[in-house]
Amino acid sequence: MCGIVGAIAGRDVVPVLIEGLKRLEYRGYDSSGIAVLESGSIRRVRRTGRVAEMAVAATQEGFTASLGIGHTRWATHGGVTEANAHPHVSHGVVLVHNGIIENHEVQRERLSALGYVFQSQTDTEVIAHLIHYHMQQGDDLLGALQCAVKALTGIYALAVMSEAEPERFVCARMGCPLLIGIGDGEHLVASDISAVIQATRQVIFLEDGDTAEIRRDGISIFNAEQCPVERPLHLSNVSLSSLELGEFRHFMQKEIHEQPRVLADTMEAAIDAAGFPPMLFGAQAESVFRGITGIQILACGTSYYAGLTARYWIEAIAGLPCHVEIASEYRYRKAYVNPQHLVVTISQSGETLDTLEALKYAKALGHRHTLSICNAPDSAIPRISELICYTRAGPEIGVASTKAFTTQLVVLFQLAVALGVLRGAVDAEHEAAYLEQLRQLPCGVQQALNLEPQIAAWAECFASRHHALFLGRGLHYPIALEGALKLKEISYIHAEAYPAGELKHGPLALVDADMPVVVIAPNDSLLEKVKSNMQEVRARGGELFVFADQDSHFSESEGLHVIRTLRHTGVLSPLVHTIPVQLLAYHTALVRGTDVDKPRNLAKSVTVE
């Protein structure tokens, strides 16, 4: 959600800024801009729409400079207009900002009384004027930034330049990700590693309260008390190839097809250990796991559906009660506290604000034990968690999550079995059986991917519909939820999901010949119940699209379409059945001509409320 990039070098940084912003497009945005210091003066270009349009304007205007900053904006305060796009300028001070300033109205009134004139509706312009005000009082750029942020309430990542100090720029972080890229005689800042990987693999992650001065010959970092500090240097393992499309039409399609490999990578430690030791979740995990009496899962969106799936595994395999809650709801209610419950947070980015704040709230309430499941090392959520387990999905560029979801499921399954083994609920024979199911999973997922041509044919039918209903039972109900979410996210077709047994309690009223009904029907203990629910749909003239196992014994007929996956894959069946619903959403969006990787109104990393 929004993106920042800045650079200072002995070369023209405009191509670096443009390429960095293109790498940040996946986060979601509606406008973009860059500002450079050229011959001591600020030059700025902003556009609504795609980064490519802004880049053309910058080229036509002959932008070239050794110092500059850029931004992709996802509108929060103020509409999608060029005036509201970043960078924002105040009397020779120019900045870009991610986050939300909660007290911007108070500051706006104060600054207006001092004679400042506002050109936009944004909260960001307040910060530019505040910094200029403090420079007028005698502070240098860094000091003015440090004074300004003390007056702000909210979250922010900032990069700031001034015509008065053309040999450096400064930045600040509070609640929003920001990193510094360390190059050879050049330095960069960005909200995401993908924006700097073109120039360097060496990065420093700023912490909340940090400010920094960035020069060609070095950097200086200061903590919230304005004392100089050292932050650790990290070598990123992100590759440029992982950020490129290769042979695929969209990143979402690429990421769907990467799942056999990333699932194998994520389960590698368990396979190498020939079991499910607590060590998979950190050195302290065994002592923590032995003392817990329940699990509380907090997550948002797709990660929440991963948590719902995990509840079935944790309760059935480990014999522990498991509660799953949407993070944005949990943090605003007086929640029940049991210090012996393990709080598990799930976030692809590790920066999801509602999940981060829910974790802080849980800790403040008295929850002592926390585990984060995340795809981004050194992000905010893992930094404040007691235990950490990283998925190994690699960069996920498509806004609609695919491989991050299935790798989360693998980690959650490993958690359920590890707890079960430790508690004596899983014996050696069953542990070996679970491990074998895990080994076979990448092959099962690949077989599901081989169904793509059949699923693409279904998409031709779905593309002309306005609504869809997804049904599942037990372990596969959360997969129905995920299928409905994917379809609505990228094809803009209204889709809902229900437990199949709930049809007669309301949703059946919606069923007619124009409502396609997707059913996830593996050959498990609930199959006959699902078949009965399907008959309820057929009796009302509904058209059924069924994802079934090879041995589920469905026969196609008018109004009943069936695609068969491989034979039933036990408790890991939800992962295999995830692939078809991802492909159905993708190909339906393709037929409808929507922007698959950047669906309207959505952002990849939701770092605001």
From Swiss-Prot:
Disulfide bonds: none annotated. Pfam families: GATase_6, SIS. Its EC number is 2.6.1.16. GO terms for biological process: carbohydrate metabolic process; fructose 6-phosphate metabolic process; protein N-linked glycosylation; UDP-N-acetylglucosamine metabolic process. The active site is at C2 (nucleophile), K604 (for fru-6p isomerization activity). Keywords: Aminotransferase, Cytoplasm, Glutamine amidotransferase, Repeat, Transferase. Residues 285-425, 458-599 form the SIS domain. InterPro entries: GATase_2_dom (IPR017932), GFAT (IPR005855), GFAT_N (IPR047084), GlmS/AgaS_SIS (IPR035466), GlmS/FrlB_SIS (IPR035490), Ntn_hydrolases_N (IPR029055), SIS_dom (IPR001347), SIS_dom_sf (IPR046348). GO terms for molecular function: carbohydrate derivative binding; glutamine-fructose-6-phosphate transaminase (isomerizing) activity. It is found in: Cytoplasm. NCBIfam families: glmS, PRK00331.1. Catalyzes the first step in hexosamine metabolism, converting fructose-6P into glucosamine-6P using glutamine as a nitrogen source. PANTHER family: GLUCOSAMINE--FRUCTOSE-6-PHOSPHATE AMINOTRANSFERASE, ISOMERIZING, GLUTAMINE--FRUCTOSE-6-PHOSPHATE TRANSAMINASE (ISOMERIZING). Homodimer. HAMAP family: GlmS. This is Glutamine--fructose-6-phosphate aminotransferase [isomerizing]. It comes from Xylella fastidiosa (strain 9a5c). The lineage of its organism: Bacteria, Pseudomonadati, Pseudomonadota, Gammaproteobacteria, Lysobacterales. The gene is glmS.
